[in-house]
From Swiss-Prot:
One of its GO terms (molecular function) is transcription coregulator activity. It is found in: Nucleus; Cytoplasm. This is RING1 and YY1-binding protein B. It comes from the Eukaryota. PROSITE patterns: ZF_RANBP2_1, ZF_RANBP2_2. SMART domains: ZnF_RBZ. Residues 169-178 have a biased composition (Basic residues). Residues 1-24, 45-257 are annotated as: Disordered. It comes from Danio rerio. Its main location: nucleus. Residues 209-233 have a biased composition (Low complexity). InterPro entries: RYBP/YAF2, YAF2_RYBP, Znf_RanBP2, Znf_RanBP2_sf. A zinc finger (RanBP2-type) spans 19-48.
Amino acid sequence: MGDKKSPTRPKRQAKPTADNGFWDCSVCTFRNSAEAFKCSICDVRKGTSTRKPRINSQLVAQQVAQQYATPPPPKKEKKEKPERPEKDRAEEERPDINPPDEHPVEQRDKDKSEKEQPEKEKKDREKEIIPAITKKPNSKKNRPKSDIHQSPPSERNSIQSGKSTTKTKNSHNSRPKLKNIDRSTAQQLAITVGNVTVIITDFKEKTRTSSTSSSTVTSSASSEQQHQSSGSESMDKGSSRASTPKGDLSLGHDESF
């Protein structure tokens, strides 16, 4: 045992010689000079092996004053008050532990019904939005027709009568077919509302419709002019016939005298 301790002793003595007499405080680990008998920070004597610091009376007094400055009694009263109702609550909650388990099915049904109602409302709104969107292209298609055929009232009357006949026909058919439209000029527009996508196809009118309508108007106008001219010719002939017998009568009277 003595042999083991012998090599450790010279090592302890060698440290101060290597550090030129400086020593580390065993409490605050501050490196003091060799001349200092006590630590310059914590006033611990040189060579003490304990790390327990000395109790400073001033610091202890300050800490005690801070502890008593905060009012601990109201905290204790708050803790004591809920302790009594907690026991009462525990007794009241014991019979109520089972009832929430008895009605889980009703709560689930209510939750499902509440979730289904907004979903149905969303679907109804989407259905209302879709027809409003589908009506837009029809209004666009009808506008150019009114712009093209704004000449005489006779054409408007004929167009209105044609529209009325087409409406009556379309009322019977579930899906009306579009007429006087070039299928080659198809423009598709995709509109998405929520999870529903609506595709709208726009078609342009044929150029022949305007020429045929103008030709029909000109033919009707020419027929009216022919009727008027024939009526005027018949009136001229009647007037000439009525004038000739009067002249003959006048001549006969002259001859008799």
